[in-house]
Amino acid sequence: MSDDPEDRMLGWDESVFRDEHVFEIDWLPETFKHRDTQMETLKYALRPAVRGSRPLNVIARGPPGTGKTTAVQILFDELTAQTDVKTVRVNCQMDSTRYAVFSRLFAEIFDYEPPSSGISFKKLFSQITDKLVEEDEVLVVALDDVNYLFYESEASDTLYSLLRAHEAHSGAKIGVICVSSDLELDTIDALDTRVQSVFRPEEVYFNPYGQAEIADILGERADRGFNEGVVGPTVLDRVAELTEEQGGDLRVGIDLLRRAGMNAEMRASRSVETEDVEAAYDKSKYVHLSRRLRELSDSETALVEVIAAHDGQQAGDIYDAFSEQTDLGYTRYSEIINKLDQLDIIDADYTNVEGRGRSRELTLNYDADAVLERL
C-alpha cells in the first residue's frame, strides 16, 4: 500500500462496514457466548413441550443487555424449526394490557389481526384456545419486559388467563416465560396469590457480563460487521471497558461500535481509533434511556418534560404545572410517577416538608438536556 495519506483515506464509494446490520439490536449471533448455564435451564423447562405436554414456566431475570431476549429468540427459532411447538414472543412495552397480549397471540396464531373493536376478551381467549386444541399444539409464550405489565397492574390477570387456560378449555397447553430487567421487582411477590399458586416457575438469572466476556462477544460482532483491520484490540478493549461501566449492557457496546465506525467514516479513515469511540460514547451511553423514552405514552412524555423543567420540586407543585398541559386527575398522575420511578427515569423519594407533611420529591436520574433531546 502507498504511504501517501490520500491512499489511506476512504473514497466516497467505500465504507469501513462489511455488514452494518450486524450492529442492529435484533441481529442474532451465530454463537451465543457465555450463557451455557442459562440456555440449559431454559431447554430443561421447555423440553416437555416437545413431547406434547405443558412446559415448565420460567422467570428469566437480569440487568438490561445481558442476553435474555436473545436466549429466548434462539430457543424459539430452534423449536419452530425442529418441532411443532408454537412460540410467540410478546413485547410488553408495546402490549402492556391483558387484551393487548392476547390480541398479539391471536395475530401470531391465526396470521391476521383480530377485529379492532367489538370482540370481547372472553371470545378472543376462546378462539385462541380452540385453535390450540384443534391443532393439538403446545403454545409457549414469552412475555418480554413483563415488568411493564406490572407497571400497568395487568400482570396478574394476564398470567392467570394464560396459566388457567387448560381449566377453561380442556386440552389447551400453554407455558409462559417471563423476562424481566427490573431487578427491584419481585415478580412472584407482586402477583396475586391465585397466580402464585399455579405459576411456580423455574428461575434463570442472567448476570452482568464481565469486561473480558464483553470484549469476546463484541469482537465477534466487529469481525462480522467491519472490514478486516478496521477495529484493533486497543479500540475493542476501550469499548468493552466503557460498556462495563454502563452495567455490562451489551446494547451500549453494540451501539458504540456502530457510532465509532460512523465517526471513522466521517474522518474518511479506514480504521476506527480510540478518539472515535470517545466521541461516540456521549450518545451510546444513553441507548437504554432512549429505548425507554420511545415507549412512553403522550401523557407520560409530557410529565417527563414538566419534571425536566421543575427538577427536584415537590410532586404537588409539579402537578400544578402538569395539569396546565393535560386534563388528567391526580390519581393518574400518581400512577405515571410510579411508572417513571420503576423505569428508573426519575427518583420519587418521600421527604418531610415543613407545614405539608410527607411529600414526594421528583428528580430526573439523567441530565435534563440529555432527556429532552431524546423525547
Curated annotation (Swiss-Prot):
Molecular functions (GO terms): ATP binding; ATP hydrolysis activity
Pfam families: AAA_22 (PF13401), Cdc6_lid (PF22703)
UniProt cross-references to Gene3D superfamilies, sorted A to Z: 1.10.8.60, P-loop containing nucleotide triphosphate hydrolases, Winged helix-like DNA-binding domain superfamily/Winged helix DNA-binding domain
UniProt-annotated binding residues for ATP: T66, G67, K68, T69, T70, Y209, R221
InterPro entries: AAA+_ATPase (IPR003593), AAA_22 (IPR049945), Cdc6_C (IPR015163), Cdc6_lid (IPR055237), ORC1/CDC6 (IPR050311), Orc1/Cdc6_arc (IPR014277), P-loop_NTPase (IPR027417), WH-like_DNA-bd_sf (IPR036388)
Keywords: ATP-binding, DNA replication, Nucleotide-binding
Entry's Gene Ontology BP terms: DNA replication
Protein purpose: Involved in regulation of DNA replication.
Similarity remark: Belongs to the CDC6/cdc18 family.
HAMAP family: ORC1_type_DNA_replic_protein
Protein name, per record: ORC1-type DNA replication protein 3
UniProt organism field: Haloarcula marismortui (strain ATCC 43049 / DSM 3752 / JCM 8966 / VKM B-1809) (Halobacterium marismortui)
